[in-house]
Design a protein with these regions (language model features):
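N-terminal loops that bind phosphate or other acidic moieties
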Residues: 1-265
Length: 265
């Protein structure tokens, strides 16, 4: 017997939550432990829970002590971990704590070798939390642009086109920095179509958007940009890695949970 509508709705809700739980979903997508180092990075509201799940699985094979790295989550969403550091930062408008943590993440993957593994854990909110302004602009300048984009009615794809080209870590730049190490991204999707290039602004995948796209969005919504941001969006060196870039050849993405899977639960 199903019971009252309230009980049915609660069961449906619990089923969807269980499907989305990193503790249950992540284990089936983990890559083998590497011969070299294992660096854990990531960002999102579920980043701490995902880090816990990785530690539990690595602990089962007796290699959890080899894990290192950090993930960024929203204030109030931190959980206790043993080897992977969890840093809290602001969402949806980035703050200095997020920038500092993102800089540490980028530094942690720089200089790795081909036997090393970067495991990137992404979930909803990752784009705002993984903020590292590209050279030439400040956090305050990026905040102004972010606020204007959030208030003008731009779509998530349009916002991300701007974010990527103003970032030192998004739009494939994280994976490019990690090369020649292998980069495996485990992502919980919260976007329509489950496009890895949109989830957290795609720090480990080729960016299909261009500088021209970013500037079109600015013009479309009549966004007034700080002079430094105008300069960044006008220089060719601000372009993000594209499909076929050799620096992305060892990067892959695995969607561990999608909205459709939660709905069907």
């Amino acid at each position: 017997m199903i019971g009252t509508p309230e009980i049915l709705l609660r069961k449906m809700f619990d089923s969807a939550v269980n499907v989305a739980s990193p503790k249950l979903s992540l284990r089936h997508h983990l890559p083998p432990s590497p011969m070299g180092r294992t660096i854990i990075v990531g960002a999102g509201k579920a980043a701490a829970a995902m880090a816990q799940a990785v530690e539990a699985e690595w602990d089962d094979i007796g290699r959890a002590g080899e894990l290192e790295g950090l993930v960024i989550t929203r204030y109030g969403h931190s959980l206790e971990t043993r080897w992977i550091e969890v840093v809290e930062a602001a969402h949806p408008v980035p703050d200095a704590a997020g920038v500092s943590a993102a800089a540490r993440i980028l530094e942690s993957v720089t200089g790795l070798g081909p036997d090393d593994l970067v495991l990137c854990l992404l979930s909803g909110g990752g784009s705002a939390l993984l903020t590292l302004p590209i050279e030439g602009i400040s956090l305050d300048e990026k905040r102004v642009v972010t606020r204007d984009l959030l208030n003008c009615g731009a779509t998530i794809s349009e916002i991300n086109a701007i974010r990527k080209h103003l970032s030192a870590i998004k739009g494939g730049r994280l994976a490019a920095a990690a090369f020649p190490a292998q980069t495996v991204t485990l992502a919980i999707s919260d976007v329509p179509g489950d496009d890895p290039a949109i989830i957290a602004s795609g720090p480990t995948v080729a960016d299909p958007s261009t500088l021209a796209d970013a500037n079109y969005v600015i013009e479309k919504y009549q966004i007034e940009l700080p002079p430094a941001v105008q300069m960044v969006l006008g220089r060719k060196s601000s372009e993000t890695p594209k499909a076929g870039d050799p620096l992305l050849q060892r990067a892959s993405v695995r969607l561990i949970v999608t909205p459709q899977e939660a709905l069907e639960a």
